[in-house]
Amino acid sequence: MESKYLDLLAQKYDCEEKVVTEIINLKAILNLPKGTEHFVSDLHGEYQAFQHVLRNGSGRVKEKIRDIFSGVIYDREIDELAALVYYPEDKLKLIKHDFDAKEALNEWYKETIHRMIKLVSYCSSKYTRSKLRKALPAQFAYITEELLYKTEQAGNKEQYYSEIIDQIIELGQADKLITGLAYSVQRLVVDHLHVVGDIYDRGPQPDRIMEELINYHSVDIQWGNHDVLWIGAYSGSKVCLANIIRICARYDNLDIIEDVYGINLRPLLNLAEKYYDDNPAFRPKADENRPEDEIKQITKIHQAIAMIQFKLESPIIKRRPNFNMEERLLLEKIDYDKNEITLNGKTYQLENTCFATINPEQPDQLLEEEAEVIDKLLFSVQHSEKLGRHMNFMMKKGSLYLKYNGNLLIHGCIPVDENGNMETMMIEDKPYAGRELLDVFERFLREAFAHPEETDDLATDMAWYLWTGEYSSLFGKRAMTTFERYFIKEKETHKEKKNPYYYLREDEATCRNILAEFGLNPDHGHIINGHTPVKEIEGEDPIKANGKMIVIDGGFSKAYQSTTGIAGYTLLYNSYGMQLVAHKHFNSKAEVLSTGTDVLTVKRLVDKELERKKVKETNVGEELLQEVAILESLREYRYMK
């Protein structure tokens, strides 16, 4: 088998010189400094804030500009240059508007092109020429390389270089070149992006985030609980679909469903208009300018889909006793005559109820109309071209957890008991815990995605369990109290008891144990965790367990910023070590363009490498070493006999 493989490879490397050249090239790359990793999490559909963090590389762009130009140009010019790199098209329009004379603008173009070339050169210093070429604007790659590789002894060619820039300006190409170089800088300052979960949720533009990620040069995703809800819906889970629409109605984001993904909500609206009225508990958290009649429509839709959701949950709970969720059969615990519910031996009065479609004898039975509506919605979801593209990318680039360069990336938690031992869940009569449990969860999710025509098999039900189950690594609470929050006034019923992981992650021994469970070195590895906002306002530290645990909820969701005191955190990991970056609230692109100010506050060193980390010590390095070994085998097999 191996000889056949090597014979095939020899078609590409058909002489010894080609093999040797590639081995030399790969071994040289292994000794370059590792590229910068950028970690972001909990984007929650907030595209504008997310793409700003992406454009500035969590401060890497301005850091590079300061390295080169600090003390050479004024701080105001540094801010201007940074804004030009972040938003080249918009900034160019503003700058050109300030020039009256063409000669002055042309001088500005010359100076700016020189600065941008310097910046690209500095940002690409640890990359091969081949990798740099891929990052350059394609139409100007040759010209840019000529300007980049100008040497100190280039006196004979000085006029040649000047003429290149003069001609670029004269032929009206300066804007295109500057814009292309700006995007090259953005690409060069970050080698690889990790999105540690929750692209989707309450924010208005998750679709634009997905498009941005699809076009990004190097990215992976660790699924969040909201991401899995969307994957589950696309995979055939009607209850996941009902949850998505309910959340979109609650946060006045039904546009995502209808306008962005082309899913027809008219049948649901007709059902809602027939059975439901206005209800304060279901009014959306809407824009103040939204007309009252639209708010009432959304309120009715919100009730209709919530009741469908509650009804759809019951059959799953009944057919999956291993989910251990019998206490969530809430529709059966209601006294419909008295409008009361008994929970844990205590009776509560229900408020703002909307039980028009419930048969007290069989409370979880869908009306024929409700069943028809959810079937139509599922058909629309599974036939949305755009959603299909986004979900396929999510599955291709995503996983429940990732081991990368010695670190463990995970959105939610590793379910543990009070003593830090991995919790066990029985699935198909077999116990699973820790890494094995997450692996089986992911296997079922991929199986559900591969068979969207199945709507009530174990794999599809497991997608919903990942959203709401006690031992789900994405939920990590005893129960989700959605029903109680709508209908019961007493706040004690709203509490969701968290898995002990969330306080034990402060403990170094627990974190070391988790790293070891995933086959990572506890002395050098870290757990990089999203999902929970860091309440800095109350003194909470995102660096926990003596540096073994780093919590980086990006805080992009405006709703959480009042509880955290800041917008959130991102993480950078380059060849020198790890830096945690705190962000202020992002107001608008216009503010950045006009003032040049950034949303970053402070960077904190998490870990400093004693020696610069090289490519050979990374995941990419492992792959390159395998390639080298194969090429050496080919050389021996084919050319050294």
Curated annotation (Swiss-Prot):
Regulation (activators, inhibitors): Activated by phosphoenolpyruvate (PEP) and by high concentrations of monovalent cations, NH(4)(+) being most effective. Is inhibited by two types of compounds which apparently act on the enzyme at different sites. The first group consists of nucleoside monophosphates (most effective are AMP and dAMP), phosphorylated coenzymes, and denatured DNA and RNA, whose inhibition is competed by PEP. The second group, whose inhibition is not competed by PEP, consists of highly phosphorylated nucleotides (pppGpp and pppApp are most effective), nucleoside di- and triphosphates, and PPi.
Query: Which reaction is this enzyme known to catalyze?
Result: beta-D-fructose 1,6-bisphosphate + H2O = beta-D-fructose 6-phosphate + phosphate
Q: Specify the domain of life of the species encoding this protein.
A: Bacteria
Looking at the Swiss-Prot or TrEMBL record, what is one Pfam family this protein matches? Answer: FBPase_2
Gene Ontology terms for molecular function: fructose 1,6-bisphosphate 1-phosphatase activity
GO annotation terms (biological process):
gluconeogenesis
Q: Which cofactor does it need?
A: Mn(2+)
What pathway is this protein said to act in by its record? Carbohydrate biosynthesis; gluconeogenesis
Q: What enzyme class is recorded for this protein?
A: hydrolase
- Give the family per the record: Belongs to the FBPase class 3 family.
* Name of the molecule in the record: Fructose-1,6-bisphosphatase class 3
- Name the source organism: Bacillus subtilis (strain 168)
